[in-house]
């Protein structure tokens, strides 16, 4: 734990120590009226919902600029990527302004907004709006490696799991009843799953690589109070990947609900997994927005939409394999965010094997040109 995270973990938001620290940040990075602010004029409010960060809204009764203080909990590589992406999107008007960054955190513009939740993300109109906002982010050229990252991240996660002493993994689903999965999976077999999913992806979708969010759950989408515009936030997993992986990641996560405070802290809906209600509308909105952005008149819009639906369905189980590999290691690390990581990993593995045959069929159909 970094010293700054330890400081904000051990001291209450209304403590003198925290008040003095946020005034110091205000003076250092914003200047202006913060130089004259007194401690009794400052309010620090904890913002709930961040698993990767501690977040605080800092305001004063004066004209000093309010700000959002973000204290990182992630490792250096995630923090670096998130900060780079945040700065780029800030400069291009696609996110909050960056006020400053320091070892272990940053200060940014506070956008009066609501965070979408697991219920509203299922609203057909909101789902269409999310689909329509994606293309402008996918069109950005970000100065990082253009190599697709998702499969390498899976391998890195498995290696970390093994380095922590992890071995063969039992799969006993808790919130889903799918039964296509093996009862136990070896690390060698998991690496093989990753390898052939990567092989299929290389053969079919190598020309669809764009810059992706890779973690667009509802909690990472803001709706601005002033304009109702949707803004994508929290880019620590941002990297280049196939666009279908990014879109399927969002769609698959609409079936996962993390709001239950009782164990295991996650519920995956089989109904929303097997019959996603907004897949058609979401893909229509994406295709229309993408064509508009590129000033392109589609020769066959229906075919474009159908192909994108097929693309999303292909990657759907791959997103579950991605998160299952990632959270296995968190379980060994006793990562505490209110979610049982072993339950999450096992349920996601069950979803992966349940949907794997559909992906195999899509692969075979696309190779034959019949999908």
From Swiss-Prot:
Name of a matching Pfam family: Choline_kinase
UniProt keyword list: ATP-binding, Kinase, Lipid biosynthesis, Lipid metabolism, Magnesium, Nucleotide-binding, Phospholipid biosynthesis, Phospholipid metabolism, Transferase
GO MF annotation list: ATP binding; choline kinase activity; ethanolamine kinase activity
Catalytic activity, EC: 2.7.1.32
Catalysed transformations (reactions): choline + ATP = phosphocholine + ADP + H(+)
Enzyme class at the top of the EC tree: transferase
Transmembrane segments annotated in the record for this chain: none
Cofactor (UniProt): Mg(2+)
Gene Ontology CC: cytoplasm
GO biological process: CDP-choline pathway; phosphatidylethanolamine biosynthetic process
Family label: Belongs to the choline/ethanolamine kinase family.
Protein name: Choline kinase B1
Gene name of the encoded protein: ckb-1
């Amino acid at each position: 734990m970094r010293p700054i995270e330890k400081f904000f973990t051990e001291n209450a938001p209304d403590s003198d120590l925290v008040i003095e620290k946020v005034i110091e940040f205000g003076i250092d990075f914003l200047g202006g009226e913060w130089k004259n602010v007194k401690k009794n004029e400052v309010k620090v409010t904890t913002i709930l919902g961040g698993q990767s960060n501690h977040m605080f809204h800092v305001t004063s009764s004066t004209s000093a600029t309010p700000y959002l203080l973000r204290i990182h909990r992630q490792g250096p590589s995630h923090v670096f990527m998130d900060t780079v992406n945040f700065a780029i999107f800030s400069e291009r008007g696609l996110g909050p302004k960056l006020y400053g960054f320091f070892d272990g955190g940053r200060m940014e513009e506070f956008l009066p907004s609501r965070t979408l939740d697991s219920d509203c993300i299922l609203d057909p109109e909101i789902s269409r709006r999310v689909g329509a906002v994606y293309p402008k982010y996918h069109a950005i050229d970000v100065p990082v490696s253009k190599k697709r990252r998702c499969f390498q991240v899976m391998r890195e996660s498995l290696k970390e799991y093994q380095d922590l002493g992890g071995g063969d993994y039992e799969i006993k689903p808790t919130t889903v009843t799918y039964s296509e999965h093996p009862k136990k999976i070896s690390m060698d077999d998991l690496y093989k799953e990753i390898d052939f999913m990567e092989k299929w992806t290389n053969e079919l979708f190598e020309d669809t690589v764009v810059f992706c969010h890779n973690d667009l759950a509802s909690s990472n989408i803001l709706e601005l109070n002033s304009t109702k515009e949707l803004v994508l936030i929290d880019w620590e997993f941002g990297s280049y990947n196939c666009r279908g992986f990014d879109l399927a990641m969002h769609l698959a996560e609409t079936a996962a609900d993390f709001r239950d405070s009782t164990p295991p802290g996650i519920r995956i809906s089989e109904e929303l997994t097997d019959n996603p209600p907004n897949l058609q509308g979401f893909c229509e909105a994406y295709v229309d927005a993408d064509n508009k952005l590129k000033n392109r008149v589609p020769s066959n819009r229906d075919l474009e939409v159908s192909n994108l639906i097929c693309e999303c369905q292909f990657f759907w189980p791959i997103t579950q394999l991605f998160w299952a590999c990632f959270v296995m290691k968190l379980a060994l690390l006793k990562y505490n965010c209110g979610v049982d990581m072993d339950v999450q990993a096992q349920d996601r593995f069950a979803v992966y094997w349940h949907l794997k045959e559909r992906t195999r069929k899509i692969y075979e159909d696309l190779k034959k040109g019949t999908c």
